[in-house]
Amino acid sequence: MQKRRNRQGGEKGGRKSRDKKFGSRQKSKRVLEEVTGKVQMTRDGYVFVIIEGEPDNDVFVKASKTRGALNGDIVRCAVTSERKEAGEANGRGRKDAARRREGEIIEIVERSHKPFVGVLHIVGRQAWVLMQSRNMPYDISIDFNTLPEGAKRGMKVAALIDGWDKGEPTPKGHIVDVLGMPGENDTEMHAILAEYALPYRFEPEVENAADQISDQITEKDLKGRRDFRNTLTFTIDPTDAKDFDDALSFKKLDNGNYEIGVHIADVSYYVLPGTIVDKEAQERGTSVYLVDRTVPMLPEKLCNKLCSLRPHEEKLTFSVVVEMTPRGKIENRWFGRTAICSDYRFDYDGAQQIIESDGKEPADPAIGQDVREAIVTLNKLALTLRKRRFASGAISFERPEMKVEVDATGKPIRVYEKITKEANWLIEEFMLLANRSVAEFIATSGRMDGKADKKAKTFVYRVHGEPNTEKIASLGPVSYTHLRAH
């Protein structure tokens, strides 16, 4: 074990490089500038300091000049050399010059809060976490007296760095989670989550706060909401979906048009600003989907119950409601808080069967003729919207999507290609319609003619960045060859 630790401790200069101050040995080095950034480390101990907002302007640091900085740390770095190298030809036929900067770390501003995952090794009363990570070249020394209960030799664990003393070959740390035996499904899944600092459980106080939220809808809750509880409403989701995020409502109007509602759960009604649940959601940022499980942003009572649009349950929602002609033209639109009660829960296969049979299949008396006709009509409208969208210059980014089927223990048993059909497009088109309607409403200050308003309110739009010039350049020869062949 000692041999391994010394080997990873690095070269002689490595000890000096961990001094906190910029040492006198560097007086001959000219410092071009100082930058602050995040460490991105390789398995060999090399470091790239990534500067926020400047991903293509990183600084290379040799293993001997890292001063004990590790992957994910925030550091100050002195840039000591810079040169320009010819880059790839850009889309305008010129070659962009690439900056190649080198430097050394002069201060560790903040240690990373992300744990490192490895295997616990114990010899006598000494303990280490042996690293298996591609961005952590050093094992972590653990104080034997701090080992958590249940931690045994050979187990996978997650550890945080406490510090790296001058002259020591490895950093010191402590174990924050015992993940289990390597190779077991739960262990490996938890290891993935731990490596990316994704919590797979909620603290008891967060769970308790969510459990205190009432699931009863009162007249007070309905005040100011448009009532869709008696309007035909349904959801279409994957077969294995546990929460139902959005729903569609459908109603024929006397003038021959259709009233179509796109509804999502009104999470803001339940998760109030500044509450412990709100703060936890901000920390998590999003739900994370693994092959065999979901790591939710909100506790189960919220994501799978209160905010899941389950059939035959009254729900508080936020909605985009449009009046649409049979030709797919939008006549009116409305946005606001609503209340719904979903009548049906379909999976994509079930909805597809109705579409392909023109509403005649499946022969299930529990599925009313009204919802069959609604799905068939909505599909025709969705195809019209889709055709119009592509005619206006939309690009399809559809690629084959692979799905992994697992058994009850989480073991993969089958990999298959997910086939996208009309039922998927139906949901996709109406979700896009809702998003686009909101963006147009803000940009035009509510005008129906689609013309922009200079006095429009400030809004956050999703705008794709400019294509990478090097990638465009590399596409040119391929496109030319393809066109010549045809």
Question: Over which residues does each language-model region extend?
Answer:
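Short intrinsically disordered, low-complexity coil segments enriched in acidic
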Residues: 2, 485-486
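Electropositive polyanion-binding surfaces
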Residues: 153, 158, 163-166, 181, ...
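S1/OB-fold single-stranded RNA-binding interface
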Residues: 2-235, 239-247, 253, 257-261, ...
